[in-house]
Amino acid sequence: MPTCSLPSRVKGSRPTRLNRYLESAGRWQEILDPALTVDKPHYRFNLAGREPFTLDGKEQVGMLYGHWTATNQCIFYVEDEDVAVGDHMVIGRGIGYQQTLGSELAAAGLDVDPKALYLKKSQIMMLWPYDDQCRLLGEDVWEFDTAEAGLFKLDPADVLTVAQSRKLLDPFIKPLPPFDDSLLPK
């Protein structure tokens, strides 16, 4: 089976961490660079309390990233995460937190202030498959256990903006080295 040597690339340059930093810094366009992501990525989401949905292609993925960035919903983090790395995928499981618009939570049927921003807590599982050149094929994201779920209304002074996040994360965002074609099967 061909391998992209993802374990060694993850150890040296951490592509999934780079994607997270770029996303939370509002620099999502860089995630869709052809060196990092295939031309037609496929994203699947199964979020508690919502209908599952998919995104096909960079245009749809970019629309979601763009919306999250414009509304400060691209700010998220994961704690207590376990990560497994294989030849063609990275899997993470942990407790995720994401700033989320009250209006979107209300549209999903939750009794919240639609004008507020919330910090949403959930148990999540994420899978990032990669091709032979270590380019992202997409994402699968599941909120799998509502027992640990939480929703915290944020005081406007506690909302982290994309500009603030970018200032904090930019020093940690380093470009990946070029893909080494010698890793491809002969």
What are these regions (language model features)?
Residues 1-30, 34, 181-186:
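Short, low-complexity N-terminal intrinsically disordered segments enriched in polar/charged residues
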Residues 1-5, 72-75, 79-186:
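A beta-strand edge to alpha-helix "cap/lid" segment located at domain peripheries
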Residues 8, 56-57, 161:
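Secondary-structure junction/capping motif
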Residues 17-19, 32, 36-38, 64, ...:
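Broad hydrophobic/π-residue packing in well-ordered secondary structure
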Residues 20, 56-60, 120:
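Soluble or luminal CAZymes and related metallo-dependent hydrolases
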Residues 20, 49-53, 112, 116:
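Conserved aromatic-histidine-acidic binding/catalytic patches
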Residues 26-104:
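A solvent-exposed, acidic/Ser-Thr-rich amphipathic alpha-helical stretch
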